[in-house]
C-alpha cells in the first residue's frame, strides 16, 4: 500500500480552530460575515444558544448586532459603539444589557474581534459574550473600552493604544505619517437624542500626564480641549453625486458628537477610526436620515473646526502609505446594517438608533495576525484567530515530512543497514570471535578489523536515525499530520524508541579492552541485540509489499536469512562441544576428516578454514529445511541431533507455508491491493480517454486515494448483502448510532423505527474544497453533518458555516415535490455526512405515524437550502398533480345517458318552430317555479351537511361563506363543471386559490371549525398533514366520488324523464340548472315532492309544443353541444349569444308587467356564471351546470 500520508490537502480549519480554542474555556460566541449585508451571523456555538435561549436556526442569518436580544433597557450608546467597531473593523469590548428569549435581562461584555485574510481585509467578526457579575460591574465603571493588556500603569495604557500620539509630541501641527486615520471628534453641544454618554469627564491635570496633554493638544488645538465641531455632511469621498446640504439642510444644525470616555484611551473624545469615513458613524440622531455612502458630493470639504486641519492634512499627505490608504476607500465593498427604532412600550423591540451604512474597510497595513491584546484577554494560543482561507498543514522548521523524498531515501538506507546487521551480526558472533581473532585484535587495536569499522559506522547511522525520528511527522488517529516536536517525541517514546536505542548501542566498544575470557561470549550475545532492528523491516512490510514480485523476493530472503542464522547456530554448537568430547565424533571433526584437515590440539590454526565451516553449516541447514538431508553431513552428538530435529520442524513449516502456498499467500496479502490497482487503473483510463485536464485529474486521483484509505477498499453495500436483513439493520444501527442518539429529531423513536431509519442512511465522505450541492440542484436528500465543517455560499459569498451535528437540506414533509437548492455547499475540511433520500424518509414516516409527528416537530434545519421561489410553485404543482390524479381516476362517461340525450334532442328539434309563440305563455309560471327553487335549495342545504363529513370537498365551504357575506361567490362555483367526459383541472385549481384568498380576507367570520377542516382535508398548517394522511384522504375521496358518480347517472336519467313528462311549463333559468357532481340525491327527492300527481294528471293534456320556446331551443341544442364538446370556447360564446337574445325578448315581453312581476320574472333568468350576476343568485351556488345538459343554449 502507499505511504499513509494523512490529511495533507489544504483545509480551511477556521471553524475547527475557533471551536477548539473557545469551547475549552466555555466561551459564548458567534461568527458573522463582514462581507455581506447586515453582517449576518453564519455560526453560533452551543454556549451562546444556552445563554440566550435561542436555537441555532433562530440565530442564523440575523444581524451580528443581535437586535433580537435588545430591549428597552439596552442603551443606544452601546449599540452605536458596537456598530462603530463593526464599521471600523476594530477590536472593542462593550458592556451591553441584553434580553433572554423569555424576556429576562442579563449584562454581558460584548467583545468584537475582526478576522482578516492574508491581504488585511476583514472577512469575519468573532463576537464573544461574557457574563458580567455585580462585582465586576461595580469594580469596572467603564462601559466602552478598547481591548488592552491588563496593566495598572496609566502611562502604559495610553501609550499602547495610541502609539502614533508619541510622534505628535514632536510634530504638533500634523497628523502622524504612520497612522493618518486618528481623528478627534468632540462637541460641547448635547442633545437628548444623542447616543453619547453625558457622564464622561474631560481630562484634567491630575488624570493626564504632560506627554498625554501634549498629545491631546496636538490633535484638537493648542488652546482648546473640547472644541465645537460641526459636521455639515458625512465625510466620505466615494461618489460625488449630490450636495448633502441641499438634501438635508437640517443636518447643518445638528453636530455629530462623541462625549468623553472615562477610559484613558478616549481622553478628550479621542478614538481611532479606520478612515475619515468613520466620522459619519458618530452621528446617530434618530430623526436624521442617513444616506448611502455613494450619495455624497462634498467629499468632506464642508468640515468645520479642527476637521479642516485634519482633512487638509490627510488630503494633502504625500506619503505613499497615506495615499494608499486614502485610495482604497473608493474600493470598499459595502455592507448595510439596519438598526430598528425602539418603541418603549414594547419590551422586546430594539432601542432607537439611526439607519446607517456599516462598511468593513480594507486596511492593508493593519496586521491580520493575532494581536497581543487579544491573546492576553482571551488567554488563547497564537492561532486563536486563523485566517479564513485554505491552509496547508503547518510544518515547523527543521521538521521532516514522513512522506518526503529524503525520508524515503533514508528509510531505504536504513533498511540496507538492517539487512547487513541481520547477516553479519550472527556471523561475527559465531565465527569470528574466537581466541585467535581476539588475540590479534588486542595486539593491533580496534581498527585492525575492517568489519569492526563497518559496525561502528552502522551504529553511528542508527543513532542518527533516532535523532531523525524525533523530527519526523506522523499521522494520528484523526488522519492529521502532526508536526509539533513535543508531540512527535512523546509518540516516539511510546513506540519504537526503546528498541531502536538498544539496537544502536555499540556494545563491543563498551567492553573493548577488558581482556577477560568471557569477552567473546558476552560480545556475541550483546551484539545479537542489533537483530531488533528487524522489527523495522516487519513494520514496513506493508509499505514494500505492494507488488507480487517483491513479496516473492521477500519470502526468499526470509528463508535464506533463517537458514543463515541456523547455520551460525549449527557451527556454534559444534565449536562449543568439540573441546569437551573425548571421542572426536562431532560434525567439525567429521568435516576435517572428510576434507583432510584434521584438528590438532597442539596447533590452534589446524582444522578446516572458516570458509569450509560456514559453507558446510549452511549446506546442512538448507538441506534440512527443504528435505530430510542427504547424510554426508550428519549430527552425531545429542546436542546436534536435537538441533537437527528443530531444524526439520522449522523447515517443514516454512516449506509448507511459504513454498507450497505462495499463490495463496499473494492472493491473501494483496487482494485489497489488487482491487486498489484495478480501480486506480480504471480511473486513469477514464482520465486518459476523456482527456481530463491536469488540475481536475489531480483532484480525482487524490480523492480516490483518500477514499480508499478511509474505507480501506471495503464496499459497504457488498458486505451487507451477504447478511440477513436483521443483521444488516443491527450493523447500520451501530454505524449510525452517534447520529441517532445526538439528533433531537430521532429521540423517542422506537427500536424498529430506528432500525428502519438506519437502513436508509448512507455515509458520504468529502475532502476539502469538494462541492456537495450546487446551486440549482434538486434537493433529493437530507444531510446530517457528523464530522468536519462546511460552508454555504450564495454568489460566492459565505452565508453560513456548519459544523458537527448540523442539518441542511429542505423540509421534505412540507412539499409534494423536491425543490431546488439556492446555494452551494462546499466542504472546508474532511467531512463525514449522513444523508437520507427524500422518498426513503417519507416512507419510514408513513410506516411509523406515531414517530412522524415527533420527528417533524423537532426537526430543525440549520440551513434551509430550498429556493424561495420554488415554494409557491410547489403548491401549484401539488394541486396540479392532484387534478391529474383525479382526472386519471375519475370517469363520468355514460353511454346510456348519451343515447338518451340524442333521442330527446331529435324529438325537440321537430317542435322548434313553435317555441317563440308559446314563450309568452310561460311567464305566469315563473313565480311558482321560483318558490319551488327556493325550497329545493333549502332541502339541499339541509341534506348536504352530514354527507361531506370525512370527504374532501370545497363546495359547501364556498356556499356557506357566500351565504354569510353575500359576496360574489358564483365564479368559482360556476367554473366547476361536472362534465362526464372531463373534469377541468384548471377550474379546481382556481377554486382552491379562491378559497385561500377568501379565507385570508375573512379569517374570523367564515373560517370553518376544526372538525370541518379535518373533514375537508384542510389543515391549520401545511406541516400538519403527513404523507400517509394525504393518501388515506385521497382514498376516501375516491370512494365518495365513485358513489356519487353512480348516483349522478341514475338521478340524471330520472330528471330527464320527469322534465319531459311534466305538464307545467318550466322557466328557462331553472331548466338550465342541474345539481353538481358532488351531491345529486336530494334533486330526485325534491322533484318527486314538488310535482304532485294531481298537477301532472291535470296538465297531462299539454303537448310538447306548448312548452316554453327557450326550453325547446335548449333541448334542440343538446345534441350540438355534445358534438362540439372539443371546442368549448366556441360553445360558450354561442351559448352567451343565445342567452343574450333571450334576455332581450324577455325584457320586451315583461314591459307590460308591473314592476313587482317584472322583478320576480327577471331574477331567475340570470345565470350565476355571468359577469353581471347579482347577489341574489347566491341561493343556487350549490348547483352546477352540465355542459351537455339540455338547459344550455346553443346553435
From Swiss-Prot:
Residues 434-449, 516-521, 571-614, 636-641 are extracellular. It comes from the Eukaryota. Changing residue 480 to S: Lower channel activity. Pfam families: cNMP_binding, Ion_trans, PAS_9. InterPro entries: cNMP-bd_dom, cNMP-bd_dom_sf, Ion_trans_dom, K_chnl_volt-dep_EAG/ELK/ERG, K_chnl_volt-dep_ERG, KCNH_animal-type, PAS, PAS-like_dom_sf. Residues 615-635 dip into the membrane without crossing it. The potassium channel is probably composed of a homo- or heterotetrameric complex of pore-forming alpha subunits that can associate only within their subfamily. This is Voltage-gated inwardly rectifying potassium channel KCNH7. It comes from Rattus norvegicus (Rat).
Amino acid at each position: 500500500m502507499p505511504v499513509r500520508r494523512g490529511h495533507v490537502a489544504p483545509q480551511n480549519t477556521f471553524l475547527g480552530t475557533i471551536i477548539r480554542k473557545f469551547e475549552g474555556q466555555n466561551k459564548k460566541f458567534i461568527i458573522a460575515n463582514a462581507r455581506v449585508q447586515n453582517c449576518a451571523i453564519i455560526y453560533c456555538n452551543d454556549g451562546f444558544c444556552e445563554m440566550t435561549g435561542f436555537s441555532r436556526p433562530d440565530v442564523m442569518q440575523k444581524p451580528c448586532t443581535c437586535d433580537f436580544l435588545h430591549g428597552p433597557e439596552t442603551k443606544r450608546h452601546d449599540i452605536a459603539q458596537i456598530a462603530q467597531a463593526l464599521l471600523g473593523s476594530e477590536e472593542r469590548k462593550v458592556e451591553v444589557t441584553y434580553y433572554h428569549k423569555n424576556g429576562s435581562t442579563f449584562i454581558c461584555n460584548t467583545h468584537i474581534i475582526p478576522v482578516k485574510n492574508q491581504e488585511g481585509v476583514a472577512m469575519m467578526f468573532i463576537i464573544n459574550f461574557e457574563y458580567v457579575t455585580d462585582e465586576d460591574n461595580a469594580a469596572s465603571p467603564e462601559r466602552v473600552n478598547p481591548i488592552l493588556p491588563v496593566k495598572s500603569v496609566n502611562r502604559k495604557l495610553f501609550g499602547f493604544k495610541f502609539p502614533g500620539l508619541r510622534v505628535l509630541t514632536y510634530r504638533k501641527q500634523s497628523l502622524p505619517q504612520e497612522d493618518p486615520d486618528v481623528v478627534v471628534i468632540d462637541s460641547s453641544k448635547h442633545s437628548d437624542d444623542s447616543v453619547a454618554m453625558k457622564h464622561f469627564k474631560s481630562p484634567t491635570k491630575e488624570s493626564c500626564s504632560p506627554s498625554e496633554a501634549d498629545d491631546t493638544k496636538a490633535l484638537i488645538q493648542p488652546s482648546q480641549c473640547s472644541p465645537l465641531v460641526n459636521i455639515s455632511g458625512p465625510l466620505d469621498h466615494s461618489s460625488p453625486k449630490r450636495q448633502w446640504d441641499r438634501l438635508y439642510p437640517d443636518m447643518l444644525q445638528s453636530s455629530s458628537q462623541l462625549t468623553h470616555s472615562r477610559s484613558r484611551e478616549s481622553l478628550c473624545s479621542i478614538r481611532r477610526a479606520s478612515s475619515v469615513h468613520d466620522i459619519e458613524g458618530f452621528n446617530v440622531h434618530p430623526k436624521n436620515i442617513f444616506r448611502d455612502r455613494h450619495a455624497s458630493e462634498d467629499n468632506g470639504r464642508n468640515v468645520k473646526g479642527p476637521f479642516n486641519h485634519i482633512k487638509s492634512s490627510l488630503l494633502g499627505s504625500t506619503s505613499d502609505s497615506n495615499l494608499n490608504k486614502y485610495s482604497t476607500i473608493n474600493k470598499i465593498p459595502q455592507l448595510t446594517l439596519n438598526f430598528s427604532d425602539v418603541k418603549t412600550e414594547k419590551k422586546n423591540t430594539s432601542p432607537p438608533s439611526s439607519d446607517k451604512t456599516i462598511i468593513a474597510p480594507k486596511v492593508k497595513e493593519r496586521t491580520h495576525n493575532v494581536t497581543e491584546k487579544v491573546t492576553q484577554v482571551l488567554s488563547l494560543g497564537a492561532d486563536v484567530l486563523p485566517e479564513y482561507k485554505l491552509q496547508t498543514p503547518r510544518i515547523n522548521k527543521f521538521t521532516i515530512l514522513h512522506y518526503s523524498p529524503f525520508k524515503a531515501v533514508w528509510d531505504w538506507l536504513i533498511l540496507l543497514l538492517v539487512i547487513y546487521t541481520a547477516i553479519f551480526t550472527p556471523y561475527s558472533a559465531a565465527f569470528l570471535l574466537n581466541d585467535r581473532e581476539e588475540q590479534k585484535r588486542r595486539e593491533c587495536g580496534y581498527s585492525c578489523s575492517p568489519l569492526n569499522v563497518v559496525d561502528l559506522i552502522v551504529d553511528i547511522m542508527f543513532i542518527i536515525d533516532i535523532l531523525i525520528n524525533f523530527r519526523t511527522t506522523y499521522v494520528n488517529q484523526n488522519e492529521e499530520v502532526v508536526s509539533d516536536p513535543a508531540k512527535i517525541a512523546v509518540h516516539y517514546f511510546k513506540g519504537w524508541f526503546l528498541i531502536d536505542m538498544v539496537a544502536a548501542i555499540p556494545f563491543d566498544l563498551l567492553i573493548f579492552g577488558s581482556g577477560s575470557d568471557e569477552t567473546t561470549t558476552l560480545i556475541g550475545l550483546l551484539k545479537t541485540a542489533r537483530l531488533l532492528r528487524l522489527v523495522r523491516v516487519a513494520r514496513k512490510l506493508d509499505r514494500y509489499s505492494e507488488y507480487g514480485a517483491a513479496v516473492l523476493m521477500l519470502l526468499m530472503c526470509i528463508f535464506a536469512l533463517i537458514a543463515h542464522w541456523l547455520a551460525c547456530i549449527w557451527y556454534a554448537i559444534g565449536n562449543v562441544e568439540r573441546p569437551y568430547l573425548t571421542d572426536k565424533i562431532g560434525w567439525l571433526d567429521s568435516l576435517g576428516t572428510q576434507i583432510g584437515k584434521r584438528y590438532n590440539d597442539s596447533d590452534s590454526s589446524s582444522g578446516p578454514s572458516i570458509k569450509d565451516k560456514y559453507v558446510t553449516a549452511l549446506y546442512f541447514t538448507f538441506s534440512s529445511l527443504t528435505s530430510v538431508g542427504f547424510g554426508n553431513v550428519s549430527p552425531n552428538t545429542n546436542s546436534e541431533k536435537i538441533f537437527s530435529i528443530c531444524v526439520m520442524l522449522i523447515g517443514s513449516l516454512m516449506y509448507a507455508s511459504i513454498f507450497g502456498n505462495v499463490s495463496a499467500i499473494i492472493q491473501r496479502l494483496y487482494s485489497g491491493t489488487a482491487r486498489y490497482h484495478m480501480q486506480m487503473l480504471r480511473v486513469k483510463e477514464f482520465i486518459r480517454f476523456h482527456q481530463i485536464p491536469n488540475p481536475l485529474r489531480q483532484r480525482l486521483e487524490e480523492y480516490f486515494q483518500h477514499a480508499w484509505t478511509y474505507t480501506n477498499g471495503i464496499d459497504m453495500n457488498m458486505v451487507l448483502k451477504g447478511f440477513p436483513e436483521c443483521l444488516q439493520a443491527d450493523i447500520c444501527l451501530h454505524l449510525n448510532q452517534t447520529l441517532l442518539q445526538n439528533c433531537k429529531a430521532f429521540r423517542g423513536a422506537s427500536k424498529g423505527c430506528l432500525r428502519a431509519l438506519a437502513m436508509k442512511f448512507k455515509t458520504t465522505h468529502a475532502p476539502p474544497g469538494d462541492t456537495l450541492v450546487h446551486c440549482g440542484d434538486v434537493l433529493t436528500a437530507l444531510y446530517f453533518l457528523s464530522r468536519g465543517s462546511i460552508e454555504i455560499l450564495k454568489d460566492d459569498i459565505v452565508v453560513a458555516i456548519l459544523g458537527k451535528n448540523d442539518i441542511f437540506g429542505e423540509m421534505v414533509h412540507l412539499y409534494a415535490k423536491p425543490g431546488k437548492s439556492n446555494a452551494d455547499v462546499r466542504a472546508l475540511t474532511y467531512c463525514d455526512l449522513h444523508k437520507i433520500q427524500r422518498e426513503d424518509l417519507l416512507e419510514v414516516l408513513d410506516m411509523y405515524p406515531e414517530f412522524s409527528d415527533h420527528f417533524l416537530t423537532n426537526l430543525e434545519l440549520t440551513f434551509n437550502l430550498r429556493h424561495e421561489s420554488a415554494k409557491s410553485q410547489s403548491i401549484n404543482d401539488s394541486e396540479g398533480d392532484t387534478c391529474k390524479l383525479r382526472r386519471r381516476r375519475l370517469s363520468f362517461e355514460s353511454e346510456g345517458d348519451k343515447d338518451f340525450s340524442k333521442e330527446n334532442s331529435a324529438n325537440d328539434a321537430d317542435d322548434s318552430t313553435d317555441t317563440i309563440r308559446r314563450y309568452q305563455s310561460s311567464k305566469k309560471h315563473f313565480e311558482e317555479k321560483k318558490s319551488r327553487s327556493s325550497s329545493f335549495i333549502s332541502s339541499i342545504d339541509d341534506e348536504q351537511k352530514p354527507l361531506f363529513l370525512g370527504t374532501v370537498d370545497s363546495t359547501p365551504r364556498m356556499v356557506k361563506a357566500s351565504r354569510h357575506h353575500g359576496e360574489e361567490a358564483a365564479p368559482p362555483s360556476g367554473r366547476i363543471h361536472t362534465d362526464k367526459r372531463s373534469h377541468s383541472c384548471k377550474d379546481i385549481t382556481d377554486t382552491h386559490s379562491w378559497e385561500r384568498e377568501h379565507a385570508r380576507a375573512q379569517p374570523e367570520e367564515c373560517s370553518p371549525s376544526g372538525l370541518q377542516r379535518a373533514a375537508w382535508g384542510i389543515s391549520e398548517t401545511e406541516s400538519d398533514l403527513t404523507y400517509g394522511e394525504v393518501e388515506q384522504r385521497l382514498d376516501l375521496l375516491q370512494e365518495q366520488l365513485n358513489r356519487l358518480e353512480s348516483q349522478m347517472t341514475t338521478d340524471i336519467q330520472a330528471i330527464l324523464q320527469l322534465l319531459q313528462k311534466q305538464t307545467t311549463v318550466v322557466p328557462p333559468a331553472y331548466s338550465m340548472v342541474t345539481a353538481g357532481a358532488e351531491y345529486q340525491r336530494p334533486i330526485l327527492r325534491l322533484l318527486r315532492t314538488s310535482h304532485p300527481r294531481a298537477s301532472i294528471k291535470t296538465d297531462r293534456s299539454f303537448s310538447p309544443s306548448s312548452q316554453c320556446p327557450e326550453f325547446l331551443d335548449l333541448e334542440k341544442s343538446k345534441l350540438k353541444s355534445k358534438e362540439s364538446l372539443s371546442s368549448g370556447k366556441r360553445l360558450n360564446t354561442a351559448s352567451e349569444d343565445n342567452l343574450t337574445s333571450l334576455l332581450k325578448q324577455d325584457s320586451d315581453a315583461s314591459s307590460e308587467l308591473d314592476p313587482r312581476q317584472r322583478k320576480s320574472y327577471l331574477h331567475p333568468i340570470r345565470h350565476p356564471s355571468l359577469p353581471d350576476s347579482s347577489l341574489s343568485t347566491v341561493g343556487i351556488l350549490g348547483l352546477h351546470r352540465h355542459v351537455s345538459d339540455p338547459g344550455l343554449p346553443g346553435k
